[in-house]
């Protein structure tokens, strides 16, 4: 932590969102990070200190949320064609993931775990994500932690609508896993977040090489833009009672369907901090 404090810098994207004489803040995060990113930058720290609550996508400190997440990971898995399951097992073994984990839980979770294993090879870990840094700071100062969504809301957007869609998701994920360009795309995304490069993030769909199939495009739209109206509702509701520091994945911030645009349309004054 001492090393992180020595390298403390503002990373990501931060807006002040104001209405009714009250200021809240909207922070675009990256869900995985590096140990040296755990210390908050000065403007992030100062903005968080001005608020009365931290709002994450889900409140992982809530015991009911913890139970729901545990139940979700232990849910039934889908049956995949033999050759596809064999390919998934091979990728799983190559990433040194526990073989028994493939025997339970939604197939979509397995896809997410495979992507996270790729990120870890590039030094990015959920433990060091922006949410972790904000959560630790808020717990130390006894700042209330709230959730913008329920676990079920996230599951509804993450899980495939059918066995056929789940199979397509696995095939797309394995193709991405084999693609030698994938590490460069993740590095570009990471660099854009670190620098707060909103313009590059706005062009993500054009350069990520991750929206090449109908399944990928539909899943992305559902997972990102599709959740924004509900989170905007939650931020608006919380802001009516308390100044809130809302921390949400950075891709939820871009374009006309992004959270800054949605809140501006609801009468908030939006000011970029960094």
What are these regions (language model features)?
Residues 2-6, 11-219:
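Structured, acidic catalytic/metal-binding patches in enzyme active sites
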């Amino acid at each position: 932590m001492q090393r992180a404090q020595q390298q403390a810098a503002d990373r990501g994207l931060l807006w002040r969102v104001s209405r009714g004489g009250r200021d809240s803040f909207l922070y675009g995060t990256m869900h995985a990070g590096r140990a040296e990113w755990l210390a908050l930058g000065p403007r992030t720290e100062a903005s968080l200190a001005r608020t009365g609550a931290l709002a994450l996508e889900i409140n992982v400190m809530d015991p009911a949320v913890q139970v729901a997440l545990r139940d979700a990971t232990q849910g039934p898995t889908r049956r995949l064609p033999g050759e596809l399951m064999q390919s998934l097992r091979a990728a799983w073994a190559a990433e040194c993931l526990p073989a028994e984990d493939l025997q339970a839980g939604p197939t979509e979770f397995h896809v997410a775990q495979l992507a996270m294993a790729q990120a870890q090879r590039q030094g990015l870990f959920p433990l060091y994500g922006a949410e972790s840094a904000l959560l630790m700071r808020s717990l130390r100062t006894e700042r209330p932690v709230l959730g913008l969504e329920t676990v079920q809301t996230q599951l509804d957007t993450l899980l495939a609508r059918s066995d056929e869609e789940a199979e397509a998701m696995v095939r797309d994920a394995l193709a991405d896993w084999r693609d030698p360009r994938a590490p460069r795309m993740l590095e570009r995304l990471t660099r854009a977040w670190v620098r707060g490069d909103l313009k590059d993030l706005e062009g993500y769909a054009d350069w990520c090489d991750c929206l090449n199939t109908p399944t990928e495009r539909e899943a992305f739209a559902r997972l990102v833009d599709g959740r924004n109206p509900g989170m905007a509702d939650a931020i608006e509701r919380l802001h009516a009672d308390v100044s809130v520091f809302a921390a949400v994945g950075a891709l939820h911030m871009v374009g006309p369907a992004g959270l800054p645009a949605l809140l501006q349309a609801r009468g908030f004054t939006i000011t970029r901090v960094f």
